[in-house]
Amino acid sequence: MALKTFKPVTPSLRQLVLVDRRELYKGKPVKALTEGKSSSGGRNNLGRITVRFRGGGHKRVLRNVDFKRRENLNVPATVERIEYDPNRTAFIALITFPDGKQSYILAPQRLSPGDKVVAGESVDVKPGNAGPIGSMPVGTIVHNVELKIGKGGAIARSAGNYAQIVGRDQGYVTLRLNSGEQRLVHGQCFASVGAVSNPDHMNISLGKAGRNRWLGKRPHNRGVAMNPVDHPHGGGEGRTSGGRNPVTPWGVPTKGKKTRSNKRTDTFILSSRHNRKK
């Protein structure tokens, strides 16, 4: 879909760039596939802020998207429509099976209403189809890739994202991610063919602070602009640089400090995303 710019009749419209969503369905979602979504405002069950700079925003309805694709195997479904989903950057597709059952899936690029999609052990390499990643040919572009068999897609789910199959060995598939990381995924893990829809999401410009507030994002304050009681970078006469390496409000090093500690899955990462920066 194309980008949409506006005539600068107001200051906020001058910078505004949005994705043109005229081709999407304009009605409400299927009620049976939705549920209520309560906003936490960044607070936990004690009412304390656990994630700063969140709160407000437009009320949302949660669409139940099928990330597993393991029901109705080998049964072709018809794409009814492509819809907007306020809870994610990608678009979603409503599919209908011959028995009348419906579900939402992540919409890949080049998927249109009326197309047929199928999930099964051996499927054609066609956008929207899903199956074991080990049965797909090397070079295939995939999204919504499972990391654990049957748990549901975890990799490459946001707008425009994808991973590429670059090899196969001993029941595992080598994936190259957009970050540059190469990792092993079990061949029985499901993946969907194609790249995720809405690749122009990266080019939007919100144009004004209020549009960020509609998304539930509150103003982000710098530590050096605070008092010493509020942040390790706070205080000082006049403007200061913080006087130390960047840290979080709780004194933990940040801005480049490696935090990964999951050694259990290190063997599955063949090439780190940090290697290409060296």
UniProtKB/Swiss-Prot annotation:
Residues 212-278 are annotated as: Disordered. One of its GO terms (biological process) is cytoplasmic translation. InterPro entries: NA-bd_OB-fold, Rib_uL2_dom2, Ribosomal_uL2, Ribosomal_uL2_bac/org-type, Ribosomal_uL2_C, Ribosomal_uL2_CS, Ribosomal_uL2_dom3, Ribosomal_uL2_RNA-bd_dom. GO terms for cellular component: large ribosomal subunit. The keyword Transferase does not apply. Part of the 50S ribosomal subunit. Forms a bridge to the 30S subunit in the 70S ribosome. HAMAP family: Ribosomal_uL2_B. It comes from Methylorubrum populi (strain ATCC BAA-705 / NCIMB 13946 / BJ001) (Methylobacterium populi). Residues 212-221 have a biased composition (Basic residues). Belongs to the universal ribosomal protein uL2 family. The gene is rplB. One of the primary rRNA binding proteins. Required for association of the 30S and 50S subunits to form the 70S ribosome, for tRNA binding and peptide bond formation. It has been suggested to have peptidyltransferase activity; this is somewhat controversial. Makes several contacts with the 16S rRNA in the 70S ribosome. GO terms for molecular function: rRNA binding; structural constituent of ribosome; transferase activity. NCBIfam families: rplB_bact. This is Large ribosomal subunit protein uL2. Signal peptide: none annotated. It holds the Pfam family Ribosomal_L2. Keywords: Ribonucleoprotein, Ribosomal protein, RNA-binding, rRNA-binding.
